[in-house]
Swiss-Prot record:
Keywords: ATP-binding, Cytoplasm, Fatty acid biosynthesis, Fatty acid metabolism, Lipid biosynthesis, Lipid metabolism, Metal-binding, Nucleotide-binding, Transferase, Zinc, Zinc-finger. It holds the Pfam family Carboxyl_trans. Zn(2+) binds at residues 32, 35, 51, 54. InterPro entries: AcCoA_carboxyl_beta, Acetyl_CoA_COase_Trfase_b_su, ClpP/crotonase-like_dom_sf, COA_CT_N. This is Acetyl-coenzyme A carboxylase carboxyl transferase subunit beta.
Amino acid sequence: MLKDLFGKRKKYASIPSEKAKMDVPEGLMQKCSNCKKIYYRKEMVKALQVCPNCDYHHPMTAWDRIDSLFDNGTFEEWDKEITSANPLDFPEYESKIAKDREKTSLSEGVVTGKGKVNNVQIAFAVMDSHFRMGSMGSAIGEKITRAIEAAREESIPFVIFTASGGARMQEGVLSLMQMAKTSFAVKRFRDSGGLMISVMTHPTTGGVSASFASIGDYNFAEPGALIGFAGRRIIEQTIREKLPSDFQTAEFQLHHGQVDKVIHRQDMNDTLGKLLKMHMDGRQLK
């Protein structure tokens, strides 16, 4: 008995079962992917998905972006019915699209429409990286092109927020065609005197960065956004050199003249509102 009483203590502790752990409802908390601090999700939504601790800009949903920018109740969505097909009969493509539709409540990886920012009417497009990583297929190209053409016809500015991993490989050459299609629409719009503002968010890469995303009258970016065509590893293997640690970040692009300004997300509405108002005459402010 005494031997049992003074025996060596175990050097390990029991781990509580899953049932004994605190029951936290799914979606209640959100961890910052940069500093790893945990917040209530509603706090992050209120902060526009910017970490209060490290200022890291997390991806926003398309509709959260719209709510953060537009005058209350003024946004009208366009072309929601345009969706992706499967022209190459790519295996499992349709099921993946269906899964993303259910997850995001979006019909495609871009939302387009018009509304007012600081009482200025604009045509608008916002890409959502939660849907197929914002990859550009024929449906996204068509929706963006239509939005640009509507801006030209109505003589209003066009503003786009990009977030994309590039062209959608499941659609092959049809996805690559969207680079030329959207870029030509931008050229026609700008030739007619239209104002285009592009805001590149994390990430803006591949065919999107090499087409409409980087040819606005103003090209802005959010802090820390990854902006580039090919990936770092591919470039390093090709040129056989080590790239700078900040290569392809928004700040790197600003330093090298590829973007005009890096704008904090919480300053975006005010900055765009002032810029749009500066460019518009009194007739368009009614």
